[in-house]
Amino acid sequence: MTTEGSCPFHHTAAIGGLKTNEEWWPNRLNLKILRQNSPLSNPMGAGFNYAKEFCSLDLSALKEDLRRLMTDSQQWWPADFGHYGPLFIRMAWHSAGTYRVHDGRGGAGSGQQRFAPLNSWPDNVLLDKARRLLWPIKQKYGRKISWADLIILAGNVALESMGLKTFGFGGGRVDSWEPDESVYWGVEQKWLEDKRYSGKRDLEQPLAAVQMGLIYVNPEGPNGNPDPVAAAVDIRETFTRMGMNDAETVALIAGGHTFGKAHGAGPASFVGPEPEAAGIAEQGLGWRSSYRSGKGADAIGSGLEVIWTRTPTRWNNDYFQFLFEYEWEPTKSPAGAWQWVAKDAPEIVPDPFDPAKKRKPTMLTTDLSLRFDPVYEKIARAYYEQPDLFADAFARAWFKLTHRDMGPRSRYLGPEVPKEDLLWQDPIPPVDHPLIETDDMNSLKAKILESGLTVRELVFTAWSSASTFRGSDKRGGANGARIRLSPQKDWPANEPTQLARVLAVLEQIQKEFNARSPKKVSMADLIVLGGCAGVEQAARNGGRSVVVPFIPGRSDALEEQTDVESFAFLEPWADGFRNFYKKGCSVPQEALLVDKAQLLTLTAPEMTVLVGGMRVLDANVGRSRHGVFTDRPGALTNDFFVNLLDMDTEWKPVDEREELFEGRDRKTGTLLWTATRVDLIFGSNSELRAISEVYGAADAQDKFVKDFISAWNKVMNLDRFDLAPA
């Protein structure tokens, strides 16, 4: 009972600061990343089809509204040089620029810049204002344009409004409604720390930025040291990690810095907290500055006060002219940040707000890298001497930057999608033949099962092909059958010797079928169909008759459509579904399993049933016996769960590393099973054990088979964007 006037609540779970399960038990497996973007957090409802809405959008009218906004300077946040274009370019760049090739995470694909931590990264200072300036347009067009698309489109229109012919624009980015907690941003506990390095300067994978809270590099130079040559090393490493080569890197840096300015009118001590830490009255904005007016000529952002060209709102070649024709010396901004000034230049650069004032050209340490790194310098001079080459290179690199995480071109929407196939889009030839039908599928499955290929070989090959898919950047998957090509055919996880034999058998079956039928079957389809045949046979071996769903329509990629260097990033460091784990990785096996499951867009129950099924199907890499808790491998049964949960078995690690375990009979000490951490986590982790108990129950066999087939079918079709709305 409470007295009148006193609050009955002292604390509530809705307030941050309470100790979480993860803080109580830091080594606890994080399964939250397998249940992100729940319909419970999505206000649009289950029936909302963004692709349909976007295709009904009057894109021309929207772009015209954006063009008008560019020069409609607002009193609450005035536009530098009377034009918001440079601000919107930076917003779009920083939205897309978090992408990294190692795991495909980051990028502009779901509008994550609106949420923590990205909305409060030091490198994203003042971009809260850019998004808020867009709100009237987002409000006007509502559901027809996502924030994710609008952010990138605003950058495109900004470039066009300042004289650049862009390469194109593809819509189709669907907004998320919560932070993406699957992304590992680094171990640091403070902004701008760099504990991510080891050795001389080896950047931890999969990270693609030099410090916590930066998009790429420190613009002052490594750790604030104004050394252009050393900065070039960081630039090359980080831009490579987001999929850019040297020519694209030079084009992007020079093209982006053709416009606008950096903001460092005063010391950072005048700047208030970032959006996530700001008071409720700030309404989602942050970095309120008490330095003079706090805006316009008094704005403080990065702390750098740099204007690169004479025409900061027009596309031209000033950037390279200034870079090469002037001599540069280091200086400090009013905020105390290292930058460079053209010591032999006249005052020819305009002031952003006072037309009577002029400045000397200024640049960043990372700009000077394009002159003093010998490889970058050669490229930069070519762009300087050939402005048309530069304009085309920047337009193409910008398109790649802003579309890199969208997957194949078939996912792009709208009238401005370029018709040209680009190698980084992982193109696949269109299907140009009649597809097989049910009778053909049954005939082909019979041929496959009569060929001598085992259940394990069929399941293993289909999984190896399909499980390369990454929901992060929509790369990989079974479509294209790139498992036939380098580099995938040589990955140790794919058992190259066995793979070559399986593919040879399937290719002969394909050849014979295609020779006698007007309908054709691709190798991509046949590999998946073989896996389905294997699962059906395994179910029969376990006493169940089932039909595994199969939809034809895949095509076979060509070698010239496959970027070997780029596809190398899809090679698995670990695949817990096949009990594969490369040596030398410090991340626990079970954590890498969850990471893989998240990239496959699986839920915790789907992950669980797939691991249990793959074990009894004997699908471990190298045919290891770890986790094969059954005396009838090749039969689709729930034996994995029954035996894992058997309390007559006692588990102990084989050594102090606790990566391999032996399960012995508690009474006799007889060795029954061996297991990895991935296997035992399903009995150890309380959440996974709860799911395992469902599948280990006496009445669970039918449910197990049904759920395994459902999850299997999901993985086989993850890259079939032609089957489901965007």
From Swiss-Prot:
Pfam families registered for this protein in UniProt: peroxidase
Cited SUPFAM superfamilies: Heme-dependent peroxidases (SSF48113)
UniProt modification remark: Formation of the three residue Trp-Tyr-Met cross-link is important for the catalase, but not the peroxidase activity of the enzyme.
Region (Disordered) residue spans: 471-490
Residues where heme b binds: H257
Catalyzed reactions: H2O2 + AH2 = A + 2 H2O; 2 H2O2 = O2 + 2 H2O
Binding note for cofactor: Binds 1 heme b (iron(II)-protoporphyrin IX) group per dimer.
Enzyme Commission code: 1.11.1.21
Function recorded in the entry: Bifunctional enzyme with both catalase and broad-spectrum peroxidase activity.
Subunit: Homodimer or homotetramer.
Protein name: Catalase-peroxidase
Organism, scientific name: Methylacidiphilum infernorum (isolate V4)
Taxon lineage: Bacteria, Pseudomonadati, Verrucomicrobiota, Methylacidiphilae, Methylacidiphilales
Gene: katG
